[in-house]
C-alpha cells in the first residue's frame, strides 16, 4: 500500500464511523516522499513489509503498523494484519495502539526535557528535593539522572494492582520501597523509577502529567491521536491488547494493559499512553531535527543531544536518559545495523521506536503482540529483523 493510499484509507475510515463525542481525531503524520528520493530501495522496503505480514500470519501478533522516515519525510507507512484475534477488521494506518513502556520516552522523558530547558529540573539534583516522600536508606543519594538511567537501585516493579487499592496508596508504596543496591552501582530496569519521576514532573509542572503533555507537546506538535485515557468514542480505532485474567477479567480495549499504570488511574510515567504511527512520526522527526519541527522549537538541540547519549551509569550500561541505545553485542531490539549513536525504546505490548541520527532515520513498529495473551514472545525476533531489513533498504545513505 502506498503512503497516499494508506492516509486516504485512514481518513475514510474515520469519516465512515460518523460523529462521536469527542470526535475521533485524524492524524496527519509528516509529509510523505518517494522512498528513492530518501535513499531507500522500494523493493527492499517492500521486503520488510512482506516479512512483517508473514510474521502476523504466523501468529507473532494480530496486526501491526510499520512507519519508516528520513529527513523529516515519511518513506513507508504500512499497516498489516487485523485488529485482534477476535476482531478481523484490517489494521489501518491510523490504528491506535497501547504504547506500554514507550510512554517512558514519548511522554515522561519528553516532559523532563522541557523542564530541564526551563531550568526547573536539575539532572543531578536529589530526588528528595522534589519528592520528600521518597524515603529510605540511601535514597537521599538518588538523583534524577539515576532514575532516568534505571540505576537508582529500585526494584523492577511492585504488584500495586494487588497490594494497593488507591492511587495515593500505590504512590506511597513506590516512594517508600527499599533500594536493592546503592544508587549508581547497578542497572536494573524499573517501572518504579518512572513512577517516581512522574511525581517529580507533576510537581514541577503544577498539573497532572497528561494535561501537561497535551498542552506542551501533543497539542503544539499536532498529535491528536496521542493521549492517556482515550475516550469511549475512540474504541473502534484502538487495537485490543490482552484478555486480562488476573486483574480486570476482560479483554482490554482502550484501557492501559500495564497493571501498575491501571492502579494509578491510567495516567503514569511507566505506561498508559496511546498513539498511532502517524503521530509518532512527528515526534521522531522533531527529535532527529534537534528538537524542532517546522516553526516549532519544542526542545533545545543541546538537551536532545544530552538525553539521547549513553550516560555510562553504571559503567557499561547502554542507557541514555530515558532512552536506550543499541547493545554492543548480543541481542538488541534495534537489530545489528543501526549506528551506535541510535536511541530508542520498546513497549511490552509489542511496540518499538528507534531513531538513528547518523542516518537521520526512524523506524516505528506498533503491534499488539499480547493479544490474546502475553505468553507470545515472537516479537523479540521480529523487532530486530525488521530494523535490519529497513537499514538494508537504505541503499543510498548519501542522499
Segments and roles (model prediction):
Residues 36, 54-69, 86-146, 181-193, ...:
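Short active-site loop at a secondary-structure junction
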Residues 1-6:
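Bacterial N-terminal signal peptides that target proteins for export
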Residues 26-36:
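Acidic/histidine-rich, surface-exposed loop or edge segments in extracytoplasmic proteins
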Residues 65-67, 146-148, 227, 353-354, ...:
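Structural recognition of the beta-strand scaffold that forms the well-ordered cores
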Amino acid at each position: 500500500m502506498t503512503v497516499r493510499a494508506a492516509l486516504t484509507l485512514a481518513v475514510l475510515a474515520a469519516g465512515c464511523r460518523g460523529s462521536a463525542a469527542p470526535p475521533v481525531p485524524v492524524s496527519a503524520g509528516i509529509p510523505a516522499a518517494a522512498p528513492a528520493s530518501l535513499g531507500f530501495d522500494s523493493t527492499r522496503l517492500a521486503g520488510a513489509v512482506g516479512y512483517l505480514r508473514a510474521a502476523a500470519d504466523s501468529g507473532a501478533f494480530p496486526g501491526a503498523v510499520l512507519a519508516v522516515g528520513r529527513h523529516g519525510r515519511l518513506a513507508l507507512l504500512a499497516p498489516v494484519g487485523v485488529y485482534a484475534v477476535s476482531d478481523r477488521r484490517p489494521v489501518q494506518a491510523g490504528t491506535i495502539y497501547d504504547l506500554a513502556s514507550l510512554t517512558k520516552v514519548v511522554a515522561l522523558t519528553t516532559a523532563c526535557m522541557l523542564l530541564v530547558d526551563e531550568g526547573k529540573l536539575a539532572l543531578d539534583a536529589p530526588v528528595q528535593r522534589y519528592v520528600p516522600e521518597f524515603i529510605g536508606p540511601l535514597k537521599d543519594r538518588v538523583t534524577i539522572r539515576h532514575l532516568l538511567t534505571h540505576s537508582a537501585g529500585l526494584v523492577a516493579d511492585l504488584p500495586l494492582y494487588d497490594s494497593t487499592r488507591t492511587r495515593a496508596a500505590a504512590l506511597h508504596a513506590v516512594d517508600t520501597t527499599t533500594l536493592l543496591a546503592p544508587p549508581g552501582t547497578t542497572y536494573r530496569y524499573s517501572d518504579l523509577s518512572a513512577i517516581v519521576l512522574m511525581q517529580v514532573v507533576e510537581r514541577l509542572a503544577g498539573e497532572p502529567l497528561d494535561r501537561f503533555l497535551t498542552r506542551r507537546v501533543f497539542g503544539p506538535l499536532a498529535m491528536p491521536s496521542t493521549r492517556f485515557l482515550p475516550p469511549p468514542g475512540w474504541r473502534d480505532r484502538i487495537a485490543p491488547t490482552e484478555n486480562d485474567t488476573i486483574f480486570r477479567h476482560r479483554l482490554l480495549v482502550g484501557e492501559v494493559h500495564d497493571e501498575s499504570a491501571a492502579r494509578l488511574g491510567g495516567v503514569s510515567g511507566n505506561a498508559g499512553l496511546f498513539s498511532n504511527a502517524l503521530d509518532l512520526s512527528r515526534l521522531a522527526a522533531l527529535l532527529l531535527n534537534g528538537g524542532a519541527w517546522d516553526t516549532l522549537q519544542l526542545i533545545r538541540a543541546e538537551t536532545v543531544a544530552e538525553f539521547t547519549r549513553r550516560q555510562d551509569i553504571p559503567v557499561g550500561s547502554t542507557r541514555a536518559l530515558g532512552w536506550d541505545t543499541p547493545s554492543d553485542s548480543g541481542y538488541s531490539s534495534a537489530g545489528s545495523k543501526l549506528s551506535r549513536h541510535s536511541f530508542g525504546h520498546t513497549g511490552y505490548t509489542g511496540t518499538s521506536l528507534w531513531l538513528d541520527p547518523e542516518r537521520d532515520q526512524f523506524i516505528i513498529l506498533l503491534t499488539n503482540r499480547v493479544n490474546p495473551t502475553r505468553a507470545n514472545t515472537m516479537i523479540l525476533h521480529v523487532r530486530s529483523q525488521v530494523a535490519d531489513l529497513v537499514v538494508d533498504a537504505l541503499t543510498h545513505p548519501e542522499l
